[in-house]
Swiss-Prot record:
Coiled coil: none annotated. GO terms for biological process: viral DNA genome packaging. The lineage of its organism: Viruses, Duplodnaviria, Heunggongvirae, Peploviricota, Herviviricetes. Its main location: host cell. It is found in: Host nucleus. Disulfide bonds: none annotated. Associates with TRM1 and TRM3 to form the tripartite terminase complex. Keywords: Host nucleus, Viral genome packaging, Viral release from host cell. This is Tripartite terminase subunit 2. HAMAP family: HSV_TRM2 (MF_04015). It comes from the Viruses. One of its GO terms (cellular component) is host cell nucleus. InterPro entries: Herpes_TT2. Pfam families: Herpes_UL33.
Length: 106
């Protein structure tokens, strides 16, 4: 029988109930990427990074190619302005740009 003392959380009570039944549960994580990527991205860290970059690319594509009001829109706009500004300064320092209007930092 479960001990319903007020000190225990619902999760702890559920855990006790499951353990009393004596059953073992197997947790399986199915791959989200095709098998080809297992060769290209051998480590779990590389695969997670690949997925993260993919999600950022999707957010960027939505920002650039459509008037989508998503959570990332403002962040992307700020990062694009910052990146453009940094590139402009680097190119000016190296004397590559003769005219500032090539990169609009506004």
């Amino acid at each position: 029988m479960m001990d319903s003392s007020p000190e225990k959380t619902n999760l702890e009570l559920l855990y006790e109930q499951v353990c009393e039944q004596g059953r073992e549960f197997e947790v399986v994580f199915y791959p989200m990427l095709p098998r080809l990527y297992e060769m290209m991205l051998p480590s779990l860290e590389a695969r997670l990074n690949f997925l993260s970059v993919g999600y950022r690319h999707v957010a960027f594509s939505r920002y650039v190619h459509g008037d989508v009001d998503c959570v990332h829109r403002e962040v992307m706009a700020q990062k694009m302005v910052l990146l453009t500004s940094i590139l402009s300064k680097l190119l000016n320092v190296n004397g590559i740009l003769e005219h500032q209007e090539y990169l609009n930092t506004e």
